[in-house]
A protein has these predicted regions:
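Short hydrophobic/aromatic patch on the recognition helix
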Residues: 50-61
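Hydrophobic/aromatic-rich alpha-helical bundle segments in the mid-to-C-terminal region
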Residues: 113, 156-196
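Short, basic, alpha-helical segments at the C-terminal edge of helix-turn-helix-like DNA-binding modules
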Residues: 73-79
């Protein structure tokens, strides 16, 4: 019994180390993509930045595209979490909480938002990550459905103007995009531009 427990503990510890190393790879890759641009970053440079061997990167990700799409998924998951928190607050009476959560999550790191948008275009036809891109689109549709349901309830309560729910959602999206553009210009003025 004791050897089974210690064996299970070893397996859990190995999994924990594996996941920590995977996150280290993603963090290194993201920093390089933002600093150097996608095309100038290689799996070797990611490995060097993460302080591991190139072969170790391939134990986690078969291709550079898998690393790129993982960055996209992580970003979208963070937005999904924030929007869900905002929807819950909106349901509890803070009518602007969902829009605020959306704005804050998109504007917290405009350079990352821009990178993810660029990656979506770049990877749109990549067959090796088609399943992951579909997962991304499922998350986005779920976010949109949650927002539309919440907005419909706010319209029904008379809190928001009675127009189709997607008008409100798209207005928030357009404002976030406009704000992101202003933030990008400000970042460019200071000389810290992102090369993609």
């Amino acid at each position: 019994m004791n050897s089974k427990t210690s064996s299970a503990e070893r397996i859990r510890e190995k999994k924990k180390v594996f996941l920590l190393r995977e996150q280290k790879i993603i963090d290194a890759a993201l920093a390089l993509f933002l600093d150097d641009g996608i095309d100038r970053v290689t799996v070797s440079s990611i490995a060097a930045r993460a302080g591991i061997g190139k072969g170790t990167v391939y134990k986690h990700f078969l291709t550079k595209n898998e690393i790129l799409v993982r960055i996209m998924l992580d970003y979208e998951e963070s937005i999904t979490k924030r929007v869900a928190e905002g929807v819950a607050l909106s349901e509890a009476g803070e009518s602007g909480a969902a829009a605020k959560a959306y704005f804050e999550s998109r504007l917290a790191r405009p350079e990352l938002d821009r990178l993810v948008q660029h990656l979506e275009v770049r990877l749109g036809d990549a067959e090796d990550v088609a399943d992951q891109l579909e997962q991304l689109h499922v998350m986005r549709r779920s976010n949109e459905d949650s927002l539309n349901s919440m907005i419909t309830r706010l319209i029904d309560r008379g809190v928001l103007e009675d127009v189709p729910p997607h008008y409100h959602y798209l207005a928030c999206w357009a404002l976030a995009k406009g704000q992101w553009s202003c933030a990008s210009v400000a970042v460019g003025i200071t000389g810290s531009t992102v090369t993609i």
